[in-house]
Amino acid sequence: MELKKLMEHISITPDYRQAWKVVHKLSDILLLTICAVISGAEGWEDIEDFGETHLDFLKQYGDFENGIPVHDTIARVVSQGKIT
């Protein structure tokens, strides 16, 4: 699947977080996580490291306006598991 097609699907995923607390878009976090895991990331810190290393690439498909989220944020958002 092309990343642009993947982003079309990710971008319609509902975000149940409290809007006033959101710093990083859900679609950015999901794109980062998927790409990192496909590339061999095995934990939250690996995902963060992947993002820092590949930020220019990720920005071709996502906004990443506030950079890469820290691993605690990635873990918290992905672990919420309210994706339908």
Swiss-Prot record:
Protein origin, superkingdom: Bacteria
PANTHER family in the record: H REPEAT-ASSOCIATED PREDICTED TRANSPOSASE, PROTEIN YBFL-RELATED
Further details from the record: Missing up to 300 C-terminal residues compared to orthologs.
Protein name in the entry: Inactive transposase YbfQ
Gene responsible for this protein: ybfQ
